[in-house]
Amino acid sequence: EIVLSRVVIPQTIVVHDGVPTDSTAKNYYVPYRDYIKNVACSEIYSTWPESSITANVLAIMSFTLNRVYTEWYRNQGYDFTITSSTAFDHKWIPERNIYDSISIIVDELFADYLARPNVRQPILTQYCDGRQVQCPNWMTIL
């Protein structure tokens, strides 16, 4: 098993445009920052309040960096970093439009991620809308 010795913000990530087992899906080499902007524009609304966009961008970056840090797909024998399939990862769309409200926040948070105290590894964060995706204790006060 390969796990990086430290958290690295990659210059580029390899996005497999399909499910992991689809050998016909194209691999795209995408600058990390552009990938995060694309995913955020594909997963959330640009009209949301700034705090909501910020929270979601942090979740996207943490999930992505967890895939990078743990070498998740490479440890399974694949030659990519992450997929575009929401069954496994985030929605990513080649050449999609990027909204300014999201782009600015990604630029501000570029190297940030969520982690537990005294744990270096970025958290594999979940998305929950309460309808299509259910998460334990979502929208509850603990």
Tell me the role of every PLM-derived stretch.
Residues E1-L142:
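Conserved, single-site charged/polar hotspot
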